């Protein structure tokens, strides 16, 4: 055992060098030391020669000194998995951070696992109904698929994720795992309390100090944590989700935000002595992303459906970080600042968002044709906007005037009040059934609702509500 102990030789920020005597820990092994009375975990990243390894620290390195003893655990970071994690908050190394005592785990599992083999994967296509009109109609999510939510700062990615957790937990009742990767601690705290309020999780204070009966496990590595924690916390969350999947569950895995995973990797990359690639990102960007994304998949045992918020630096979709994640996704939901500026929420761009599920073979002809007609109408309106800006509406043909009027109604009907946003908007949230969504938009593009004013379609659920609102507006005007 004695030869498994090394000593710290150098500390540079989050990167720590440890020298061993003869024994050399494997790459990705977890090493442990105590820093001012707290357990500190280091993960081996490189072998430097002369029995020295370079490691990434999973917590703050202030207080570490040269010569401090470090022990090799002989395995990657191990985290608790199973039903005991539900309703609890843990950090990257599996320690509880919610002050409710230790997590009673069925087992522990290493955070680095191989991706399921080709033979283990399942490939059937089925859509996951979210109750959000714009998503279900134009870019539907695949059950067991990967979904990316793209958007700049402040266009509503986190609110959309919270609404999805809320809707799917209510409609589908399965387990969820939420990985908070490098996002705001306040939002993490809000999410925990909102989950208790919406009965997704149980309040331990009213449940005899236990979170039993909860539906969602939370794994946090927030903005204030060192890059090591932010670069690994997504893997910790995924490990918890994989365990539920292997037990035959359909799991929802939420990551907010996958960009911070890449960002953390780029922060430690330079300290590890790697030559940066485009825009200063790590040269291993695609490999890191692939190692995470290939594990998020549906097997013959169960499924993982993942929804990942992806921050787009400076609203530039060609930035290497968002671009690296595009290749892995089944559906992309792009949030647009220009739509948010019109006050239309969720600010999903109906022409930029895509899904491989948008096919008549999967959705049926009625849904597919309605979605395509909606996109055609919006695309025509977009093409006419330059003419309208220069010459005004009067110069358009009668046909184009009708198209513009319908497109403006469609734009407004794509908005919807959310349950989790009730506190901001004051209007109760709406969950819209898929057949109501299709019927409503089909009527709109066919001109059945041309008589209603466009305000009637703003922030309503189903078409019945829009008709009701139209009557109310007409009565007020009279």
From Swiss-Prot:
Q: Could you confirm whether the keyword Kinase appears in this record?
A: no
Tell me its EC number(s), please: 7.1.2.2
Q: Which residues form the signal peptide?
A: none
Q: How does it assemble?
A: F-type ATPases have 2 components, CF(1) - the catalytic core - and CF(0) - the membrane proton channel. CF(1) has five subunits: alpha(3), beta(3), gamma(1), delta(1), epsilon(1). CF(0) has three main subunits: a(1), b(2) and c(9-12). The alpha and beta chains form an alternating ring which encloses part of the gamma chain. CF(1) is attached to CF(0) by a central stalk formed by the gamma and epsilon chains, while a peripheral stalk is formed by the delta and b chains.
Q: Which gene encodes it?
A: atpD
Q: Which SMART domains match?
A: AAA
Name of this chain's protein: ATP synthase subunit beta
Write out the entry's keywords from A to Z. Answer: ATP synthesis, ATP-binding, Cell inner membrane, Cell membrane, CF(1), Hydrogen ion transport, Ion transport, Membrane, Nucleotide-binding, Translocase, Transport
Q: What does this protein do?
A: Produces ATP from ADP in the presence of a proton gradient across the membrane. The catalytic sites are hosted primarily by the beta subunits.
Instruction: List the catalysed reactions.
Output: ATP + H2O + 4 H(+)(in) = ADP + phosphate + 5 H(+)(out)
Q: Which PROSITE patterns match?
A: ATPASE_ALPHA_BETA
Q: Which family does it belong to?
A: Belongs to the ATPase alpha/beta chains family.
Question: For this UniProt entry, what is the primary localization, expressed as one broad class?
Answer: membrane
Q: Name one GO molecular function term.
A: ATP hydrolysis activity
UniProt-annotated location(s):
Cell inner membrane
**Per its UniProt record, what NCBIfam families does this chain match?**
atpD (TIGR01039)
Q: Write down the membrane topology.
A: Peripheral membrane protein
